Amino acid sequence: ASGIRPGDKVAILAEGSNAWIISELGLFYAGAVSVPLSVKLEESNDLLFRMRHAEVKALFVSKYQLPKIRRIRAELPEVKHIIVIGHIPLEPGETALGTLRRLGRDYLSKHREEFLAIGRGIGNDDYATITYTSGTTADPKGVVLTHRNYTANVEQSLSRIDIPSSFRTLIILPLDHCFAHVVGFYIMIACGATVATVQVGATPMETLKNIPQNIREVRPHFLLSVPALAKNFRKSIESSIRAKGRMTEGLFRLA
């Protein structure tokens, strides 16, 4: 509906959300290549380099990240479509995600089989994503992963763990990382299990503060983490225990 063609590179610059996951799955169905970008990137060099290097034709962007794109929009003439996740006044050349969905429903009502044929025609060696390295020591490198890379990782992971369809997980890691991709939602989708994402706040700190409440709401069977995040969780728990007094802290240590 947006004119995106098979093989086109489409970036996603947004906080982790259900809309993020749905956007990428939609790109795969259209035969496009997803270019997930970290929300920590600054527009001056980091974003410009990656979007130019990947030859991005379109972009899904959250309302919180949109100001970055607006500041460099004139330097990205090859970007033809900007789809905005979230409610915010739009400028020329920007389309709300809700509008795109309506256009998509209308397109599918007239071209359903034509569209589904694109997805059926995707091969194992077709590109799925281009994920960029941090670029701390040199220019970032675009790591190309095929659809078979992902399905193989899912198969290998499921040979080591069992995920019943009744399981739930809450993704607290950035979705631009391959680990969150494979174990966070592709494994869950393959098993028919449930994926939830953290409620996005106006700032990264606000989003972090939503995690405990979201855990209580979702009651996940497991969480994905990385050492740095696990360390921060431990510090937060220990700080909370100490605040309750020596007796509580002593019982915690004994446990």
Question: Where are the regions a protein language model picked out?
Answer:
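Conserved pre-ATP/AMP-binding loop-to-beta segment of ANL
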Residues: 84, 101-132, 139, 162-168
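ATP-dependent adenylate-forming carboxylate-activation enzymes
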Residues: 14-15, 32-49, 63-68, 195-217
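Conserved AMP-binding/adenylate-forming
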Residues: 1-41, 172
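Conserved AMP-binding A3 loop
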Residues: 128-154
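Structural core segment of the AMP-binding/adenylate-forming
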Residues: 2, 29-103
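Conserved AMP-binding/adenylation subdomain of ANL enzymes
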Residues: 151-170, 175-255
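Conserved S/T- and glycine-rich ATP-binding loop of Class I adenylate-forming
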Residues: 10, 27, 59, 127, ...
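Conserved G/P- and acidic residue-centered "switch" motifs that form tight phosphate/ATP-binding loops
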Residues: 31, 135-136, 192
